Amino acid sequence: MTTRLFIQDVTLRDGMHAVRHRITPDDVGKIVAALDAAGVDGIEVAHGDGLAGGSLNYGPGSNTDWEWIEAAADNLTHARLTTLLLPGIGTIAELEHAYVLGVRSIRIATHCTEADVSAQHIGKARELGMDVSGFLMMSHMASPAELAAQAKLMESYGAHCVYVTDSGGRLTMDGVRERVRAYRDVLDEATEIGIHAHENLSLSVANSVVAVEEGVTRVDASLAGHGAGAGNCPIEPFIAVADLQGWKHNSDLFALQDAADDLVRPLQDRPVRVDRETLTLGYAGVYSSFLRHAEAASQRYGIDVRTILLEVGRRGLVGGQEDLIVDIALDLLAANSDSVAS
């Protein structure tokens, strides 16, 4: 059977973390137009932490979600306008307003063990006639069987697709393979499976390829890998591999390369790449969007970013606990002072 992929671009949602949620609607429009012309199937637009994510805790955006989404809608001809919502941050009212602005696909995201909080939002999105995916973040923190049980819950609420979401870039190929197989064992045949990979261990393309080999049909990727931490699966090399594998998709490789180099890389105030800090995210299994918060704490308190991230991983922090990074830095500073004093 021929493998056909749905390529979901996340440059303008996960990629918001890479620019601290600061991008003009004009730039959003240019990137969306380029992605649409390049043939991607879906384009996700929102604050990095989803609808209503702009806050002191997560980081304020330069513009509202609505300004970004309107700019995107004005530049679409065929791609599915998508957004992301975390219950407890985004509300039903915001979901409904996104629909009014033209969003027709939504990913409802929860921590990997908290699928039950997604029921209302998935139900409302289905009621509106939207395409709905469940997004189980930090998927490495649950065993394959536990994660699959959570995926089954999202399916029961009405999700058309459920993702293995490697928010920390911690999964290896075997970890992805085991989780996709566990999903397939419990989900209905009609329910799609998606993969959302991060590059922190330099495995995002490999993990996405393994996922497709195991039956995944929806693949998240971004221009130049633009995303939290070391970035997401870079769309250009993934599409190149998909071509070599003979997988069917609608994307134009050269057009994606041009958009990545001409439009996205110039926006990055910090290179999106594997380096000592971003590698530590994957090594410690830390939520990728914690990078900029940890770097700010490091600069303020003089603690190595890697030391902070290792402690974040040891304590098992999850999305929404960004404020505890400062507490961790202060604890480490106090421990260093005690060590020097003794």
Swiss-Prot record:
- Where do the Pyruvate carboxyltransferase domain residues begin and end? 5-257
| Chain positions recorded as Mn(2+) binding sites | D14, H196, H198
Q: Known catalysed reaction(s)?
A: (S)-4-hydroxy-2-oxopentanoate = acetaldehyde + pyruvate
List, alphabetically, the PROSITE patterns matched: PYR_CT (PS50991)
Q: Which cysteines are joined by disulfide bonds?
A: none
Any Pfam family matching the protein? HMGL-like
Among CDD domains, the record links this protein to: DRE_TIM_HOA (cd07943)
One GO molecular function term of this record is: manganese ion binding
Query: Mind telling me which residues the site (Transition state stabilizer) is annotated on?
Result: R13
Q: Where does substrate bind?
A: R13, D14, S167, H196, Y287
Tell me its EC number(s), please. Answer: 4.1.3.39
Kindly indicate whether the keyword Nucleus belongs to this entry.
no
Identify the keywords attached in UniProt to this record, alphabetized: Aromatic hydrocarbons catabolism, Lyase, Manganese, Metal-binding, Plasmid
What InterPro entries would the database entry show?
2-IPM_HCS-like, 4OH_2_O-val_aldolase, Aldolase_TIM, DmpG_comm, DRE_TIM_HOA, PYR_CT
Which top EC class is given? Answer: lyase
User: What are the catalytic residues?
Assistant: H17 (proton acceptor)
Enumerate the Gene Ontology biological process terms. Answer: catabolic process; L-leucine biosynthetic process
The Swiss-Prot or TrEMBL record describes its family as follows: Belongs to the 4-hydroxy-2-oxovalerate aldolase family.
Q: What is this protein called?
A: 4-hydroxy-2-oxovalerate aldolase 5
